From Swiss-Prot:
Homotetramer. Forms an RuvA(8)-RuvB(12)-Holliday junction (HJ) complex. HJ DNA is sandwiched between 2 RuvA tetramers; dsDNA enters through RuvA and exits via RuvB. An RuvB hexamer assembles on each DNA strand where it exits the tetramer. Each RuvB hexamer is contacted by two RuvA subunits (via domain III) on 2 adjacent RuvB subunits; this complex drives branch migration. In the full resolvosome a probable DNA-RuvA(4)-RuvB(12)-RuvC(2) complex forms which resolves the HJ. Belongs to the RuvA family. SMART domains: HhH1 (SM00278). This is Holliday junction branch migration complex subunit RuvA. Transmembrane segments: none annotated. Its main location: cytoplasm. GO terms for cellular component: cytoplasm; Holliday junction helicase complex; Holliday junction resolvase complex. It comes from Anaeromyxobacter sp. (strain K). Residues 1-64 are annotated as: Domain I. GO terms for molecular function: ATP binding; four-way junction DNA binding; four-way junction helicase activity. It is found in: Cytoplasm. The gene is ruvA.
Amino acid sequence: MIARLAGRIAEKRDDHAIVDVGGVGYLVHLSQLSLASLPPPGEPAALRVYTHVREDALDLYGFATEDEEAVFRALIDVKGVGPRAAQNILSGIEARELAQAVAQGDVARLTKVQGIGKKTAERLVLELKEKLVALARAAGPARAGAEADVLEQLRTALLNLGYRPPQAEGVAEALRDSAEGRPLDDLLREALKRLRG
C-alpha cells in the first residue's frame, strides 16, 4: 500500500496530478481543493495517499491535509459512496466544513454539494456523525482573528478574479499555516503563483 508520495509535480490536470518520484510518474486523483493547493509543476510536493485496489486497476487518491484524508476514509465507509464519489464531494466542500455539517445534522447544507442528494445526506449524517464529531469540534464554530480575516479577503479576491470557489478555498487552506502576520497582497501573489502552476 502506498500511504505517502513525495516528489515533484510533473503535471496538474482537472482532477489529478502526476507526481514524479525518482523518475516514476504516479497519477494521483485529487479533489479540487487539494489540487489548487499544490505548487506549480517542477516544484516539490508531498501528498498523503489512499491506495484503492480493484480487480482491474490500482488507483491513488491524494490529499493535501490530514483532515481531508480522514473525511475521505470516513466517506468511503458509507454504503454507496466509493472513492471517486468521495473525492467529488470533497471538491465541493472543505473537509472540516463537511464534518461540521454532518455533526450538526445539517442535511440542507450537505445537499448543496454536487453529488449529495437528500438520501445520501441523511445517510452521511446517520453513519458518520460519531466518526466526525472530533474533527467538527476542531473546526470550531467559526474561524476567528486576523488570520481568518485575511484568508477570507484572499478567497474573495480570488473569486473576483474569476477562480472557482473550490480553487479559492483550496489555495486559502494551503496558505493557512503561513498566513499569520502576512499582508493580503503577499498572500495573493503566492496564491496566484500556485493556481497558475
